[in-house]
Amino acid sequence: MTESGGSDMGMAGAGAAATAFDGSVLEANPAGMARLPGTTITVAAVPALVQLDFKGSATTPGSAHNHEGPKLTGSAFAVQSFSGLSLGLGLYSYTGLGADFGDEWVGRRVIEHEQLRSLNIAPAVAYQVTDHLQFGGTLRAQYVEVEASLAVNNSAALYGPPAGLPDGQVSLQGHSWSPGGDLGIAYQPRPDVELGLAWTSAVHHTVDFDVTAAGLHPVLGAILPQALPVSLSLTLPQQVAASGAWQATPATTLAATARWQEWSTLGEARQMSGLGDRPMFPQGLRDTWGASLGVRHRLPDGTRLSAGVAYDSDPSREGTMPAYFPSSSQLRLALGGEWPAREDLTVRLALSVIQQGEVRVAQLGHPLPLPGVGPLSGTFPASRFYFAALAVDFRR
């Protein structure tokens, strides 16, 4: 997620590692904190909506729609700068969102509802080495919460009588805390040019699940304890981002960012249970790259308007994804506006719309190897994600 509510959100992340417009620079490149004078506090509310549909194939016909409504995320950053030294604290999400396809769709035995939430608590420090060069870093405590629910086949053909039972339900919920960090460098070779390079570390999590079940066939109810305990081992990817910004005129800034993310490490995620150790991504994932271009313009009354476009490549290795991870290439369009409510307070609005490419599903099994899951094939046609932001910056 690049939508943390900072000024760079209205530029689709362009220039994020090079500029220092507000407190969210702590997340994008902690070195930029050294360019924020005095005290800076940034608080943002970021509602998100996912429009996602599934269309089955001839072998597994049917359709589904994501019934999950808008979700509210947010962030908060505080930076205090002294003589050559800046200290900060950030609270923000790294990745998240989820989907709810209901209990009637053809893939209900693969996934009905899923949710991934994350929170970073990140103390940070930055140092002004020279008038043109800054270094910075954070040490993050990252919290991840995972929820999933799926239907379970109660067919008498699998377990014997009684026959005619509806599907049962299995739900998993767990969380994990793990450390991570960020390093960054910012450099201004001349007054109208800003450059930045930032690294975000990978973070490994082992999520131990609480498993609950309801409505199971008596035989399956006796077998299920053999599957316990259930856990998920995953690594959220590291990232490297390089940004530049050019003050083309006294009122206009042009910016760009190039980034690389190591999604192949997430592709090694595995689910462990008493029934075995299985990959979440049998075909793995591949690393992705992305690029952003943006512009920011100041009007005579102090209002600032921004716009940006970004592209991120497809993480699938063989062109297909599991139904519980419908991710593909993404095109991001963004707009933003900032208004000086008073000398020490700025109000910001931003909108980011992500157009995601088609996702093909060709799933033969499930990481939780319960009987009767069956294959699932079809597509998630081009989908859209919407992020809005209402943020305030306080400076003193």
PLM region spans:
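Outer-membrane beta-barrel porins/channels
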Residues: 1-4, 8-9, 59-62, 71-75, ...
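Outer-membrane beta-barrel pore proteins
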Residues: 15-21, 26-39, 78-84, 96
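Transmembrane beta-strand segments of Gram-negative outer membrane beta-barrel proteins
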Residues: 1-15, 34-52
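Long, well-ordered hydrophobic secondary-structure segments characteristic of membrane-embedded
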Residues: 43-52, 66-80
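Surface-exposed strand-loop-strand hairpins of Gram-negative outer-membrane beta-barrel proteins
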Residues: 10-21, 50-69
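Intrinsic-disorder/low-complexity, polar/charged segments
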Residues: 29, 54-56, 249
